[in-house]
Amino acid sequence: MIASCLYYLLLPAARLFRFLSDAFFTCRKNALLAKSSSPQVEGNFAMAPRGPDQEECEGLLQQWREEGWNQTPSTASEGPLADKGLAESSLALLMDNSGEQDAASEDKWSSRQLSDLRAAENLNQPFPEVLGEEPLAEVEGPLWAAVPVQTGPQYADCAVLPMGAMAAEQWEEDPAMVAWSIAPEPMPQEETSMWPFEGLEQLQPPPMEIPYHEILWREWEDFSTQPDAQGLEAGDGPQFQFTLMSYNILAQDLMQQSSELYLHCHPDILNWNYRFANLMQEFQHWDPDILCLQEVQEDHYWEQLEPSLRMMGFTCFYKRRTGCKTDGCAVCYKPTRFRLLCASPVEYFRPGLELLNRDNVGLVLLLQPLVPEGLGQVSVAPLCVANTHVLYNPRRGDVKLAQMAILLAEVDKVARLSDGSHCPIILCGDLNSVPDSPLYNFIRDGELQYNGMPAWKVSGQEDFSHQLYQRKLQAPLWPSSLGITDCCQYVTSCHPKRSERLKYGRDFLLRFRFCDLACQRPVGLVLMEGVTDTKPDRPAGWAECIFEEEISELEPVFPRTIGTIQHCLHLTSVYTHFLPQHGCPEVTTMPLGLGMTVDYIFFSAESCENENRTDHRLDRDGTLKLLGRLSLLSEEILWAANGLPNPFYSSDHLCLLASFGMEVTAP
């Protein structure tokens, strides 16, 4: 209780004592400041020269009291120096200093000095213009706080500027400080482009100063005047010329499902509307006669791609992937150049077969070229065009080989002519295999020994998962129930055609001469002596019955080779997969920043003897001749344009474009 009383009594007394002591020391400090022998202050606060006449100073002080004392405001908000008694004591101490002062400047100096003392005391800072005095500690607080301007009636021409305000004016006017000023914070925008994928941060727009047209320029390589592999010059006869493009256009759904592959891209260039406009410009620029597309999203195809391509003069066929997949393959052709003979969609999914449980598809079209009327009575062989997108998984090379075998069997059936030969063939698409891989060599060379080969090696794609588990290919690669031989042909295509009437030879019928059924007397047979009354004697060693398997017509048997698959389509690649002018490989895509070739255009060519080389088959132009191609780019060039996709190419693949010529023969 006593402690509480002492607390409430002594605390106010201590505060009062502290207030009085602070006021006293403040006045004393100001008096010493005025008496300081420092150099004169320049500017508006310059002091008049001091003289020895102290009586004149007292007279001036008395005059100031009579004229301005009654008009000086006294408010509690101005601090201790605003008190009338403290101001009077401060002025008295200031006048104790002997010196002669000018009467005209005394009044002006006194009023401004008092205002500056008040401002300095309020901020607890030393007078900034007096030299030789040690600065006091700065008060913690915001430097740029707004302080109202204080003025008095008799000091209307001199406002009290706080120290922070003066510093602010100096900051704005000093060009040296402005040069080092911090950049202003960006203002919030109403619309900000955001990533279309969750969990990704916003990136700055791509630098538009990149010359995409110059970096990504692709040359057209003309082979129309070059000799073929045997050194034979190109023929001068008429040709049916056409161009074909193969393009994986990157389905939007697949891009969003694998968003981590496109972190290097600005979100604006990944927008489908932007990509669709770019793709259509590419189609219009190159204007191919046949267009083979992969990763075509179904809703985009029916709503945008098919109507737009139809307006460009194309007739399109589309095959969506099986299952719940939303993309597929499309083949488009110009009806002014070709007439459709047949279209065959190919599904690689086979229920019950673990090897073929994937949803990839393909399309095979048989087209008849339309010869211009000016060439007269001439004919051109049909053209078989196959388009596919093979499984990506690098670890399942067995699945890729089985899918390719199904496609080749379908091509063999569609392209086979009545004499057993094949019409010209073009096979293109995204095969998800690199050049010189076993799958690539199988398509080009027509043969592959796969028994014991690790599955991850088939496509040649970089993948280290095989180190944990190696799946090796075993013969036979696919079961006989698939109906495809090891020569990649349908079993039904290899059967000789049967007629409805059965034909039996004499030797075959004589085998039934002494069988049990032949030796029995038919019921109701009229008995005639010497004719129907005798029973034939069966010779020794003659079988009493004929087994069913002996009389049934045997199905043709196709022996399966041990660990080897073949095909007889004689395909070769349009591209060489190497850029001699750059000394580096060609690139059609850049997954995870690694450039590689996985897209191809194969076409049928005639094989010829290779006396100097035994590793690769040497081909020459046949009915189908390669006239030109659009060059590919290197990995270094694509990285200079920030990879794929970019503002110039709106897919993660480059398009492939080739020009062909077909022989025109007289009927």
UniProtKB/Swiss-Prot annotation:
Keyword entries, A-Z: Phosphoprotein
Residues with Phosphoserine modification: S77, S105
Gene Ontology MF terms in the entry: catalytic activity; eukaryotic initiation factor 4E binding; protein domain specific binding
Pfam families referenced in this protein's UniProt entry, alphabetically: Exo_endo_phos
Keyword Phosphoprotein: yes
InterPro entries reported in the protein's UniProt record: CCR4/nocturin_mRNA_transcr (IPR050410), Endo/exonu/phosph_ase_sf (IPR036691), Endo/exonuclease/phosphatase (IPR005135)
Domain of life: Eukaryota
Protein name from the UniProt record: Protein angel homolog 1
Organism: Mus musculus
